[in-house]
A protein has these predicted regions:
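C-terminal region of N-terminal signal peptides and the immediate post-cleavage residues
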Residues: 28-48
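Pro/Thr/Ser/Gly-rich low-complexity, intrinsically disordered linker/stalk tracts
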Residues: 408-461, 521-535
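Beta-strand-rich modules
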Residues: 503-525
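Active-site-adjacent "subsite" loops/lids of carbohydrate-active enzymes
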Residues: 56-57, 65-85, 154, 159-214, ...
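Polysaccharide-binding and catalytic clefts of secreted carbohydrate-active enzymes
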Residues: 107, 148, 178-287, 291-321, ...
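Catalytic domains of carbohydrate-active enzymes, especially glycoside hydrolases
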Residues: 85-111, 214-219, 321-322
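Aromatic-lined carbohydrate-binding/catalytic grooves of carbohydrate-active enzymes
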Residues: 97-133
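Substrate-binding cleft of secreted/luminal carbohydrate-active enzymes
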Residues: 310-336, 347-433
């Protein structure tokens, strides 16, 4: 298990100074200085000899939502022990369902589901904003997820402050929006940090980089909330920031898109400088633009995130300021307004040749609704998109839905599409270098009652371990050819952060096991010796 990196967090005053400095730097140079001192670890092992690193790769993730206690905690005010038990249950479920990543909502409304000197504790933990839950949920989640072989991605909402409660007076005294009321824009029954304020952009980048620097997260994630979804013709009142900062633009929409573009680029740059193995991705609304508006848009007729939320996802893909996109394709196949197949095709074409991964946001929460009935409601989606060359996996909203109303549908999906575990996608930042871990040694495999217990020695720099079982006709040969035969998708038994794994599949005589290490970039290390099974 990789330890959680801890460091002394900056003070609020220091962050305010840094925010001002960063805002100036952004305006002058177009980049941020976060994490400039961090470097990649030294290469510790030769390249994996088999040349097939990647053929088991697939994102299988689920969102774990904290806002309004949608998933976790089940209600505010639970004890620390009760919250940890619920979180353990979700992580156990994710691992048991064959998932390999959880996207934990750590900043739902400019507050924190982790120990922060910058923003107050989220109200969804204790029932009161600023209430200390008595432990650090993110620190705990990272450690427990990694032990189970799950990536833990930190999910942030960059601008949202009040969710059905825009009154600044209801925020705790130390909330950044109350300390800086000029940052806040009320909109309907919500409130948002103004994306047009450079200090807001610098603040948000600082908050995110604080988490990246202090926690061993695998990714940083945004969902579909940028400028707010339109509400009955109501205008987002950013006149003040437009007048002060929009001078270089003739069109306010272009200026708003540029504000969001700058945030995306600055976050990506900061992560690359600090921890390049940490992925940064976005799950936008599923429609960029309709082809009736833009001939290069999708064959659809719904809300356009480019125009409604000023989120130019296509630009982020083409400019490489995101590592992946996970568009929310929450529509069934054959839906006239936005057909699932047409939308999957469009996004697949958009990422082609860019190096940006594509994961499909899947609507587990809709199972049971009209058009989403039947045990094949989810599987039929993957029947199509799972065969598209540009699709690298799926993320499900949400983990609670997978356990509850979508449980039967997910079981059918897993049987059809997830018969074997999958390694998480490898970071493109590792291209051009070999894996940073060596071969796994000391592997033993001992047979018991309907089980084989596989154990091995820890490897420096290993984030996860992948365990493979060789078929009987290749085990025991000990040759490089036999070892390479082992590290194939159909032989993967499991992925874990521990140095032991139990295989309960029926054992053939003569089968053996191979264990490989995955580094921070999720690159797979060299293949070691085959361990024969002993009684």
């Amino acid at each position: 298990m990789a330890p959680v990196a801890r460091a002394t967090p900056p003070t609020r005053a220091a962050l305010r100074w840094a925010a001002t400095a960063a805002a100036t730097a952004v305006l002058l140079s177009g980049c941020t200085p976060w994490g400039a001192g961090a470097e990649s670890p030294d290469q510790a092992g030769a390249a994996a000899p088999c040349g097939n690193d990647g053929n088991e790769r697939r994102m299988r993730g689920a969102w774990l939502t904290t806002v309004r206690n949608i998933d976790w905690p089940s209600e505010p005010g639970l004890s620390a022990e009760e919250q940890r038990a619920e979180l353990d249950s979700y992580l156990d479920a994710a691992a048991g369902m064959g998932l390999n990543a959880v996207f934990l909502h750590v900043r739902p409304t400019a507050d924190a589901v982790y120990a922060s000197e910058l923003e107050p504790w989220a109200r969804y933990l204790t029932g009161e904003q600023g209430g200390d839950p008595g432990y650090d949920p993110l620190e705990y989640a990272v450690a427990e997820a990694h032990e189970r072989g799950l990536e833990l991605h930190a999910w942030f909402n960059p601008y949202r402050v009040g969710f059905q409660d825009p009154d600044v007076e209801n925020l705790v005294e130390e909330h950044p929006a109350r300390q800086n009321p000029e940052w806040l824009v009320d909109y309907g029954d919500e409130a948002y940090l103004d994306p047009g304020e450079p200090e807001v952009r610098a603040w948000v980048v600082g908050v995110i980089m604080d988490v990246v620097e202090r926690y061993d997260v695998d990714g940083v994630h945004f969902d579909d909330f940028f400028y707010p979804y339109p509400k009955g013709g109501e205008e987002f009142d950013d006149d003040a920031s437009w007048e002060e900062h929009g001078g270089g633009f003739d069109d306010r929409g272009d200026w708003r898109r540029d504000n969001v573009d700058r945030l995306i680029a600055d976050v990506h740059e900061g992560i690359e400088r600090a921890k390049p193995w940490v992925s940064f991705g976005i799950s936008p609304f599923g429609i960029w633009r309709n082809d009736s508006t833009d001939p290069s848009g999708s064959s659809s007729a719904g809300l356009q995130s480019y125009d409604a939320q000023y989120a130019d996802t296509r630009a982020w893909i083409r400019e490489g300021t995101v590592d992946y996109v996970a568009p929310q394709l929450y529509w069934k196949r054959g839906f006239e307004t936005a057909d699932y197949e047409a939308m999957a095709d469009w996004w697949s074409q958009e990422v082609e040749g860019t190096g940006v991964d594509l994961y499909i946001g899947q609507a587990a929460y809709r199972v049971g609704e009209d058009g989403w009935r039947g045990e094949d409601a989810l599987s039929t989606q993957l029947d199509y998109s799972g065969e598209l060359a540009g699709v690298d996996g799926d993320v499900y909203f949400s983990i609670r839905s997978l356990r509850e109303q979508a449980a039967d549908a997910y079981a059918v999906l897993a049987g059809a599409h997830y018969a074997r575990p999958a390694l998480p996608p490898r970071s493109d930042a590792s291209e051009g270098q070999g894996p940073l871990v060596g071969a796994v040694g000391g592997v033993t495999a001992r047979a018991g009652d309907e089980r084989v217990d596989v154990e091995w020695e820890a490897v420096d720099g290993a984030r996860f371990y992948a365990v493979y079982r060789l078929p009987a006709d290749t085990a025991g040969v000990g040759s490089e050819e036999a070892r390479c035969e082992a590290v194939a998708a159909e032989h993967l038994v499991g992925v874990t952060g521990r140095t032991a794994l139990t295989d309960t599949a029926p054992l053939e005589d003569g089968a053996g096991y191979v264990v490989t290490a995955l580094d921070d970039y999720r690159a797979e290390g060299p293949v070691g010796e085959v361990a024969d099974v002993r009684g």
